[in-house]
Every structure is written in structure tokens, then in C-alpha cells.
Amino acid sequence: MDPIRSRTPSPARELLPGPQPDRVQPTADRGGAPPAGGPLDGLPARRTMSRTRLPSPPAPSPAFSAGSFSDLLRQFDPSLLDTSLLDSMPAVGTPHTAAAPAECDEVQSGLRAADDPPPTVRVAVTARPPRAKPAPRRRAAQPSDASPAAQVDLRTLGYSQQQQEKIKPKVRSTVAQHHEALVGHGFTHAHIVALSQHPAALGTVAVTYQDIIRALPEATHEDIVGVGKQWSGARALEALLTEAGELRGPPLQLDTGQLLKIAKRGGVTAVEAVHAWRNALTGAPLNLTPDQVVAIASNIGGNQALETVQRLLPVLCQAHGLTPDQVVAIASHGGGKQALETVQRLLPVLCQAHGLTPDQVVAIASNIGGKQALATVQRLLPVLCQDHGLTPDQVVAIASHGGGKQALETVQRLLPVLCQDHGLTPDQVVAIASNIGGKQALETVQRLLPVLCQDHGLTPDQVVAIASNIGGKQALETVQRLLPVLCQDHGLTPDQVVAIASNNGGKQALETVQRLLPVLCQTHGLTPDQVVAIANHDGGKQALETVQRLLPVLCQDHGLTPDQVVAIASNIGGKQALATVQRLLPVLCQAHGLTPDQVVAIASHDGGKQALETVQRLLPVLCQDHGLTPDQVVAIASNNGGKQALETVQRLLPVLCQDHGLTPAQVVAIANHGGGKQALETVQRLLPVLCQDHGLTPVQVVAIASNSGGKQALETVQRLLPVLCQDHGLTPVQVVAIASNGGGKQALATVQRLLPVLCQDHGLTPVQVVAIASHDGGKQALETVQRLLPVLCQDHGLTPDQVVAIASNGGKQALESIVAQLSRPDPALAALTNDHLVALACLGGRPALDAVKKGLPHAPELIRRINRRIPERTSHRVADLAHVVRVLGFFQSHSHPAQAFDDAMTQFGMSRHGLAQLFRRVGVTELEARYGTLPPASQRWDRILQASGMKRVKPSPTSAQTPDQASLHAFADSLERDLDAPSPMHEGDQTRASSRKRSRSDRAVTGPSTQQSFEVRVPEQQDALHLPLSWRVKRPRTRIGGGLPDPGTPIAADLAASSTVMWEQDAAPFAGAADDFPAFNEEELAWLMELLPQSGSVGGTI
């Protein structure tokens, strides 16, 4: 084989030996004609021109010189863009998530065919009318079409009938010609079938494979196929051969993955442009980073975007106030050139005339079709706001996606119909439209909502939930088709089907569940619930297929359990995470000293693949150079966005410690949450401002930042602290208490809005409002109190103090459960008085109420046996229920939790021992009570169940039996065994209990040395350790549903949706939270039995 000679300035390229399909076939890059059967098939062919020359210096690109991107789109049905994109969803997975880059490539490929195909772009912009049939010279360029060789039977070479059908007849002879060479290079039949999408690449890969591997040694067969099957794949591979060496060197120093990404997504022109302009792009005044160059180039039209960035970045930054990062974000999409030019033209108009912010304009422009979306916003924003009642923020949300133009036009047309005829709200219509393919989803909701509700029993809310994702149209149609099958044949519930469908790629996930559920259950021993849990994420299809393939390997070769495999797979990017665990688990354990459990913990989050790779790379650096422990590194990595958090810790830890006086432990506490990267950056920026201008301490700033959404909470404190203190009479301490929880931003905004209403109209005090708001989910709790307090007080006879106590312990869910019970009494709770119900709700939240509803096995007999063992109801045995509620409420409302214990002794006239004993009975250790760090109600309930004699085993999150029901059955069995055993003396019980008082909270207040014991599932106890306990009253109640584009940075719309899409955290066990909570003695068991129904009806439902 002749060697590939180096690139020369000559426009002609030396031909490779062998066939040159790139130069004779219209499907090659040289652009004779579009694919057969394409929408532009009849348009005249464009004169063939050489495209091998190096890009010229920055100047207006000629690629669209005859018309704009929108002119191109007008040449054919606009729906082609969306249909092609969404029909490519089987491989989409998570297109906007770093966890699934391969899926993004498929979107690029789909868009290339539908939106901006290089061979047809220049045809579409010509002024000549289309011909009725292809030109004769186009046929002349394909002698193989009429050749008998086109009828070759590839099955003789081992291809299946299905594989042969995927290969176009005219390409089969080329496949046969290069089959032997490609197989010899290690390509499979499936690889060759994929490569045949671009026939020119078959010969190129067959002839130059060894050269490709020498130039790109890390490239896999899949990588080569991924580049080769694209429109300019053959020439892109040739360009990599000649230019990879220089691109690997300064100033870009690109790695193999980056080179392949540019070639795969941007094509040959992007590779050539990056090579030609590498010095200009990275030097002054642009100063782009290699990652930014790759991001811009790795798109359709990447070469034009690079040219436009060189021309417009200085203008947009200096004249329009954008940042270089914003310019890069706009350019890093298909059509980036047009989007940048439109931003330059429309940004002043949209901001001055329509009231948008530059950030909103950037958000709209930073998508495929950004140019058209901006123009449509300019045209329709007044109409949608004035005539349809939408807000500018809602219009921006709709426009800020691929296909935003079509979505806005469809909202204008269908919003009245969907609201008036189908009962949807404008917010629901906006939610459906605010995704790629929003137009098609809205039209499908209009068509299928009546059918799904009437024929299949779904609710409108469920239909909206399915439609409000990428691929909503296809998901709705698939639910209509498969819901009966999955329920009747596979035993799923409609709710489970809806949950699977309510993700990006829901269609493919449902079809894969139908296909693989029997296999995974029968062959691999998974439960249907576990299969649903894996499927119930973006990329569920790929995750299920990977579990089928890797579960035996991971269990047999690496010692993982099926539950661990399921936990890894049950996240966005689960497919990639599983493959990375298989690859890196031995390395991380042997070379870095991690345990398999730690590896699983890191992988069991969105973006687990990237987090594992970053731990492998940065763990030695963070430990040796920055003094962190491996446990601290694992804790940071074990969150959504762990990769970014680790990299930011490496970068900012010295700055935050040296310049701002934080400790490494505080930096870890901030980073150890979803969105840790953003929180760290915001602390660096706002800590001086909050301390100097607002009087906060660094400890308070750290407390606010050490939660999911810490960035937003800090920014909201900066904005609202003066307002809440001056206008509403709160203290800075109270503002910090509200902000120092997950969802602190939303809680602060809700306090600002509802505090006057709750105080003036409902008679609450500001202290009570703060107590309700100072928890995870404070926003929802406040809104629920506003809605249900009149009902509970007027209709059911509760006092406002009782309502506040329920809301401060169990939140929104406990309040709704109490209302449901009082309105429609459940037989299992009918024997309880209102005081009993309130006490139970304060003690264990909704999990406790639900547990009693589901029934305590053999409860009447157990209660009778306890009464026989301890016949006297002594005063120290049964506490007054109202008293328990008052004590809990006192602690929850105390503005200085660390002083609450001493104040409570005075307030209630109790001794230290008596108050500690009361708290022990409600699942609080003495040390927690002394420092005011009461655990969440759900955690206290778990402890009570354990202390009652149950050996707590962490259930699978997808267990078929609910945790509460399983807990109660085990509790009953254990309690019965205890009662049958010989009775120890009461003093012995007390001694035994005292000797075992070693709760997790004991460790939680001893200092940083124990902070990072590997309990990554309980972040509220990790980060608490570096802060005064008065700031760390962590009582999570709810976890907000819905995927976030940037993990851990929720926006208002995401958290607002939590009122309708809520994943219950109450019922989930707190891993390790009660591992060593001391067992109850008989007096305490009797006290617990007094809290539960004692009539025979308790066991009636067992």
C-alpha cells in the first residue's frame, strides 16, 4: 500500500489506491445529489467543485452565499426537521447530557439528513426550478446501478437477511468488494452495514485502516464507523490522517476523542477549519480554549461557526455586553453562524422593545434553529403575552429549544383549543411546548388526550407528563399502543407505564421493556419493579440493554450484586456508567484503594461515567496536593455533576482557603451536593459581598451553599435579605435558616409572598412561618398550609398550632394525608383521635400514617401481651400526646436550635433526663436533642421501627413491597419474639440501652475528623459536621422530580413543577441513619403501642 503523503497547498489531492467512491457516487461528499428518495431528490445537481483546499482567512463563508439558513428551510416541509430528529430517538438517550455523547451524535446525524445536508444545501439555494427526474449525468455517475453486481447476495458472506436489507442494492457490490479487508481489520458485519450508509468510507477504511490506527491509536472500530458513516465521513477520515499530528500539538493539543468528535459531527470542513485557524482561535483577542474550539467545530456548519466567531466575538462582547462563554454557547450548535448574526441584529431590539434580558436572548439562540427562534420571538411575544396571557419567561422557555419557532407558532394556534376543549391550563401547554419537538407533542396531545383518558383511564395530568419531554409525540402514541399489553401481559400498572413514558426517549424505553422484561426477570432474577426503575430515566432503552449484557459479568467477575447493578443503571447515562464500572472498578479498587461499594456509590448518579473517570484522574491529586481523604473525594463525586464538582474543588480549594478563610472541610461540604460546582463558584463570588454588605458570617454563607441549589439560594439571599428584614421584620438569622435547605431559593421567595397572608389572614406568627419554611420543600409546605389551614381548623377542629407542628415536621405530604384521613377516614385509623393523628404525623410524617393504614400484623394480640407484661399505665410510661406535639413544635420553631433543649426544660418544666427520654421515644438521640438537630420525621420513624426490635435492612428502591409495609411486618415478628423471651428487669433494660447510645448524630457533632465516613447517601449529615449545629437542622422531606440540564442547578420552573411531579423521599430509608440507634425497652415499646390503634380493626386489613 502506498503511504499517505502529507498535505500540500495544492487544491488537488493525490488519489488513494483502489476505488474512489467519494469522487464518483452522488452520495459522497462532493455533492452530486441527495440520498435516493430524499425530499430534494428531484432538484438539479450542482456542479462538482473541489473542497480540498484549506479554508481561507476569516471572511464571509460562501457556503450559504445564495441565501440564509431560513431560505434553505423554506425549500421543503419544515416538519422534516422535527420528524427526522424525533424519529432518530431510538439512539437519542440523553441528547443534552454529558453522560450520553453517542446519543448526541445520532441527533447530529439525523439533523444532518433533515436540516442541513451538505450535498443538498447548495442545491436548495439555487434559483433553478426542480426537474421532474434526475439528470442523465447523475445516472452516468453510477454505473453500478444497472450492473448485475448490484444484485449480489451478501448472505453468502455471512450477512443476515435483515442486514442485507439495510444495505442499498447499489452499494452491495461495494460492500462485497471490501468485505474481506474490513473483516480482516476486525470490523463486524454490523460495523460494515453501518459504514455502508456512506459507501465512500468502505474503501477508505479498508485501505487506510492501519494508517488511521497509527494516527489515532485510541480509536475503536465504533469510533471509525461513527465518523465514516457520516456524509463527509471518507474525507473526514482522510483529513484526520494528514492533520491529526499537528492538531495534537500546541496550541490545541487535542486528544483522540476530541479529534473524532470534530470529524464525526462537523465533518471534513470542520477538521480543516480547526487546523487552519488553530492559532487565530486560541490567540488574542479571541483566546478560546481547546474545549471551546471543539464545541464550536463539532456541529453541522462548524467551519462557518468558527469563521463567524472570529468575526463577531469582539463585537458581541464589546458592543452588546455578552461574555465569550455566551458567544461560544450560541455558536456551539448547528446553524451557529446564522444564530450569531441574528443575535448581533436582534439583541438590542429584544431587550429594549420586548424587555428580555441578554441571558434570555442567549438562551433562545443557543439551540439548533436559534436564528428562526429569535425572529419568531420578536414577532409573537407581544401576541402570546397580550392575547394568550403568557409571560415573557414562558415565551422564552418555549423558544429555548430546537424547533422553538414551530413550537411558538403551535402554542399560538392550539393554546385556546387545549385549554377550552381539553381542560388543560396554560402552564401545562407551556410545559409540553418547552421541549425539542414541542410542536408535534402539542398536536398529539390534542388528538390523543381524549382517547388516553376515556379508553385507557389516564388522567390529563398523566398525559401532560408524558408529552412534556423530548419525543413526547412518539411516547404518547406508544402508550396508546402498548399500555394494554404491558399491563395485561407483563403485570405493570398504568402508573408504571406512565412513569417510563415520561422521560426523553419514552417510546424506545416502553418498547424495550416489552421486549426485555421477561428476559431480565426470568433469566437474570430482577423484579418487574427493578426493570421499571431502570427504564424510568432518559436513555432507559440503552440502560436496559446494557443491564441484560453486563449484569452477569459485573456480578460474577466483579462481585457486585444485582441490586447494585440496578442502582447504577437507574440514572441518566446508566448505560455508560455500567460500562465504565466494568472497566474501572478493578483499577479504582487496586490502584486507588476504593471499595466496590464506593465505586458503586459514585456510579449511581446522573453522569456516573464522567464521575468515575474524574475520580481515577483526580483522586491522587486531591489527596496528595490538597490534603483531602479518599472518602471526601468519593463523597464529592457521589452526586449529580460529580465530575464538575471535583474539577472545581481542585481549582478553587486553594483560593477559598487562602483568600476567603474557609477550611478544606467546608469546601468539601459545599461541593458535596448536586450543583457543587456552581455553589463553589458562587461562594467565591458572593462571600465577600454577603459578609461585608449584609453582615453574614462565612459559616452562614457555607451553610446556605451546602445544599442542592446552593448557588440559587446564595443569589436569592443577596437579593431578598434586605427586603425580608426591612419589610417583613425577619432577622438575618431567620433568613439564613430558610435558605439553608434544598430549595432555599424557592422557600425565600415564597416567604416573601406568603408571610403577610399567613400572618394577617390565618393568624400565624412570623416565627411559625419561618419554622415551616426552614426545611427541604419549604415552599410546598407553606403553600399547603395556606390552602389547608382553614379546612383543618374550621372543618376538622385542629388548632393552628397543630397545623404548624404537622407542617414543620412532615411538610406538605403529612398535611395532605391528615386532610385525607379526616375527610375520608381510613378504617385502620378510625380509632385514633385527632390528637393521636397529629402526634403520629409529627412523629413520623406521612410514612407513619401510611404504615398504620397498611396494617401492623397481629397488632391487637401484641398490644394485649404488652399490657399483660406491664399492667400498670404509669405516668412515666405514656406521655401526653399533645405534650409531645408541643415539644416538637417548640424545637422546630426555635430561632437558636442549639439553645432549644435548655429553653424547653424551662418552658415545659421538665428535667434533663425526662426531656431526653421523651426525645428518645420519638427517634432522637440525646446529643441531637441537646444541640437542636432534630432529624427529619421520616428518619425518626425509621429509627423507631429499628429500635422496636427490627434489624433494618436497606430495601431496594424498587422493591415490590413498600418499605413501610415490610418494616412493619418485620417489626411485628421481632416484637413477638421479644415478648416470648424471658423478661429482663427494667433496670437491666435501662443499663443495656444506655450502654448502646452511639447514634450517627453522636458522630455528627464531634467534628470534621469523622465527617467523611463513607455515608454518601446522607448528605445532610456529612455537610453538617463543619458548621455550627444551629445552622444544620437538615430535615429533608421531598425530592424534586424532573431532570436538570446542568445537574444540581434547579431553576424556578423545575421546582415549581414539584407540586405536580413529586418523588417521595419520606418513605425512603436514610441509609445508615439508624444503624446503631439503641433498642427500645418494654416501657418504650408500650409507649409506642399507645400511639397506634388498639381496636380489633387494626388487624382487620392484614
Swiss-Prot record:
Which GO molecular function annotations are given, in alphabetical order? DNA binding
Q: Which GO terms describe its biological process?
A: symbiont-mediated perturbation of host programmed cell death
Which spans does this entry mark as compositional bias, Low complexity? 141-151
Subcellular locations according to the entry: Secreted; Host nucleus
Q: Where is this motif: Nuclear localization sequence B (NLSB)?
A: 997-1000
Q: Does Lyase show up as a keyword for this record?
A: no
The answer to whether the entry has keyword NAD is no
Q: Where is this motif: Nuclear localization sequence C (NLSC)?
A: 1034-1037
* Pfam families associated with the record: TAL_effector
Give a Gene Ontology cellular component term annotated to this protein.
host cell nucleus
Note down the stretches annotated as region Disordered: 1-68, 127-151, 978-1021
Q: Where is this motif: Nuclear localization sequence A (NLSA)?
A: 951-954
Give the comment on domains. Answer: The central DNA-binding region is composed of 23.5 tandem core repeats with 1 base-specifying residue (BSR residue 13, also called repeat variable diresidue, RVD, residues 12 and 13) each of which recognizes 1 base in the target DNA. The BSR is probably the only residue which contacts DNA in a sequence-specific manner.
Similarity field: Belongs to the transcription activator-like effector (TALE) family.
Q: What is this protein called?
A: Avirulence protein AvrXa10
Species annotation: Xanthomonas oryzae pv. oryzae
